[in-house]
Amino acid sequence: MKGDPEILQSLNGCLKDQLTAINQLFLHARMARNWGLGGFNDYEYGRSIKAMKMADRLIERVLFLDGLPNLQDLGKLLIGENVPEMLGGDLQMLTDMRARLQDTIRQCEDTRDFISRDELSEILEETEEHIDWVESQQWLITNAGLENYLQSQMEV
């Protein structure tokens, strides 16, 4: 099935965001594990795997629409040197990702590509859940203190 060139370009933009997320979240997970923060590691690692699965879905969709998935284009990684910076970088990445997803969903609606819209809507839901988690962690750090938060994330 031949896809709309603008939709294919936008889907590749969403793919770029997921590929960037895989790398950023994976590195944050491994940094946290190195610091003994098993809980933080587990969540970030799990999210990097989810990003990989979402990227796979986008690759499949682009191929189905007779497009060429661009796996070479990556965004800037926002790597933090400590947990608050990691959360800030993740939040920035996720809010940018959400904006692109929302724009692409609207574009799919306008071109009547409802299958791509539905795929992107599921990815948007996952992204918003991740944003909620990051904002909750930031709230915990602000209200319980960084030391207490880090202690709660340590391996037992």
Label each PLM-derived region with a short phrase.
Residues 1-156:
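Iron-associated oxidoreductase/ferritin-like identity signal
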